[in-house]
């Protein structure tokens, strides 16, 4: 039998040959619109820190104060002795913010999805997924033991056809992101809810990229569409617009009690550090405030400005989020474009298979409230020049689907 290094080395060589080999670049600064890499400053257009809270003084003060009081590590899982006081405060704020009866916090959005899905359904049940649902949703579905059905992206006719044939299953769970993480487009929640009601299914939504950004109260897309009360399970993250780390689920108290008792990713994980939990509580309070409203509005002004700039370059974007995908196609071409931008001081890593389908590599450009007008113009100018220079080998377009 070949040894481990020989076999894994061969797999790595295949990744390199296919333009799929991944490396890590160390960032030697706080997260923000400008970051330091290898001693050089770069404009960062790849962050999910949409509201610029990751380095906000308010959150840093909350973190420092919590470290002074609670130390660093939680010491155990939440169900042993790791459920320090900031957890109750954060969960109360999340429930109030999301206008739900109860909330429960997980160590990450990934853990929240996997733990929730596996706690809700199993053998004898069916999960119906959008083809572009996040990997954490797919992994949770696979681990659950339930039957999995997948419908083409946002194809309501196919979703209806699948649900019509699932009447013999004990439980039917539809799961969709509200803002899709790689394309930046929005789920048709109204229509999905009609099908949920028609076929007696449950609906779970992942508001990871919507929390803090949409609707009057900034609760997410479900609020914007006016359907919050019709959703069975709402998931979100603390790591994107809220600038921290972790994931959460909001809903009925019965739901959160069930997850506390059944979600293995919660039960068997050491709790998040209390300082991060305290910072997340401060972030939720900020997002609910008038200052949070103003920060959100600044984000959308920047999104509009960048989309208008891309339009002037002939790239029309259908994105209705801060995620603006620039479709390249071939993995090698996407890597080349990303490296050319990096040489010019723009940090936008290429997104490749398996994160997106083969042949649909892209630049996933993200905008934050912290970017200045000068930052946006600098990106547009450099991107325009690079696109012309390598245009013979790169077919550039906005929105891959």
Where are these regions (language model features)?
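N-terminal "arm"/small-domain region of PLP-dependent enzymes with the aminotransferase-like
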Residues: 4-10, 14-72, 201
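Short loop-beta-helix segment that forms the pyridoxal 5′-phosphate
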Residues: 77-81, 91-115
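Conserved PLP-anchoring active-site segment centered on the Schiff-base-forming lysine
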Residues: 116-135
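PLP-dependent enzyme catalytic core of the Aspartate aminotransferase-like
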Residues: 2, 57, 61-65, 69, ...
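Active-site PLP attachment segment
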Residues: 217, 223-258
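Structural motif of enzymes handling amino- and sulfur-group chemistry
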Residues: 271-291, 302, 307, 311
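Conserved PLP-binding catalytic core of the aspartate aminotransferase-like
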Residues: 293-304, 311-345, 355, 359-360, ...
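Active-site phosphate-binding strand-loop segment of PLP-dependent enzymes
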Residues: 149-205
């Amino acid at each position: 039998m070949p040894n481990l290094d020989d076999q894994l080395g061969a797999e790595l060589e295949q990744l390199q040959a296919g333009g799929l080999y991944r490396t890590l670049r160390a960032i030697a600064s706080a997260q923000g619109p400008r970051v330091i890499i290898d001693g050089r400053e770069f404009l960062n257009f790849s962050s999910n820190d949409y509201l610029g809270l990751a380095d906000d003084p308010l959150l840093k003060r909350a973190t420092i104060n919590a470290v002074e009081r609670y130390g660093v590590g939680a010491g155990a899982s939440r169900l042993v002795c790791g459920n320090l006081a900031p957890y109750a405060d954060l969960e109360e704020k999340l429930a109030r913010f999301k206008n739900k009866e109860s909330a429960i916090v997980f160590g990450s959005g990934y853990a929240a999805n996997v733990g929730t899905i596996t706690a809700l359904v199993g053998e004898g049940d069916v999960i119906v997924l959008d083809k572009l649902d996040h990997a954490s949703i797919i992994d949770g579905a696979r681990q659950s033991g339930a039957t999995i059905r997948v419908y083409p992206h946002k194809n309501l006719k196919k979703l209806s056809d699948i649900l019509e044939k699932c009447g013999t299953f004990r439980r039917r769970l539809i799961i969709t992101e509200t803002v899709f993480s790689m394309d930046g487009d929005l789920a048709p929640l109204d229509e999905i809810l009609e099908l949920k009601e028609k076929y007696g299914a449950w609906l779970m939504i992942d508001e990871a990229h919507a929390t803090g950004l949409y609707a009057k109260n900034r609760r997410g897309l479900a609020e914007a569409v006016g359907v919050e009360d019709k959703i069975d399970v709402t998931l979100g993250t603390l790591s994107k617009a809220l600038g921290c780390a972790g994931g959460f689920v909001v809903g009925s108290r019965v739901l959160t009690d069930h997850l506390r008792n059944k979600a293995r990713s919660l039960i068997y994980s050491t709790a998040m550090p209390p300082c991060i939990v305290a910072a997340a509580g401060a972030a939720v309070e900020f997002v609910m405030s008038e200052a949070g409203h103003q920060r959100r509005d600044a984000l959308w002004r920047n999104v509009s400005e960048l989309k208008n700039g891309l339009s002037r370059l002939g790239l029309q974007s259908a994105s209705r989020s801060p995620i603006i995908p620039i479709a390249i196609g071939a993995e090698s071409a996407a890597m080349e474009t990303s490296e050319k931008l990096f040489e010019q001081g723009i940090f936008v890593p290429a997104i490749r298979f398996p994160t997106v389908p083969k042949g649909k590599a892209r630049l996933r450009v993200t905008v934050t409230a912290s970017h200045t007008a000068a930052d946006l113009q600098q990106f547009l100018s450099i991107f325009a020049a690079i696109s012309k220079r390598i245009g013979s080998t790169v077919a550039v377009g906005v929105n891959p689907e």
